[in-house]
Amino acid sequence: AVTAGEAKHGMTIAEKIIARAAGLSQVKAGDIATVTLDRLMSNDGTTHLTIGMYEKLKNPHIADKDKLVWIVDHNIPSDSPKTAASQKKMRDFAKANDIKFYEGEGVCHQVMMENHVVPGELIFGADSRTCAYGALGAFGTGVGCTDYLYAMVTGTSWVMVPGTLRFNLKGKLNDGVYARDLILSIIGKIGANGANYKAMEFAGEGLHSLSMADRISICNLCVEAGAKTALMEVDDVAMDYLKEHGREPKACFTSDDDAV
């Protein structure tokens, strides 16, 4: 947060999204901010654990059920009686609490991108690849059951503002070269820990030649370099995708020229 007399500085996309969610005019890398979450996604991998903890609370309460999206996608159809029981627990809880629920409609992140994610949002997902939402200019990050439960009950959480690694893309992919090749090449250069707790930001004229499928693939894999999140500038391709799916952006951010 900005204190009295502190000079303002340019902000990255990640910093701007966190500042918006925290109700602050400015944040910088390393700050810890209390944020209001825009959306909370969970799948059948761990939701039953979250429900179990929720039921042990003295006064259980969901802050905003409209922000919750639960998706059964990891084991369809269920592969054991134990899995079937955990999915039933998830299904029954979602119905009882009027939580948006999907089953057998696709991988959770694809379902989120097609139906819910909009630019400028801060989203927690109980899955490591929640960073995929950066393809639409949203700050998505994976959390565990305890952090998810806290956000579900309070509507808030804390976030340490990540530093940013910016990748300016040029040209376009050659025939036979795909988005997955591009991001794996980048990760190969920076290393599996090369973006630990960083935001990997993608921009440049080369971005415009990438389809939404390309962008989702790139952002999805950024966690393999340890990234806290991945973010792309919102352009005509992203806006056309939103329009096609009947949604409007919450906020479209770009990094300031003097951001560090």
Where are these regions (language model features)?
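Fe-S-dependent hydro-lyases/dehydratases of central metabolism
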Residues: 1-260
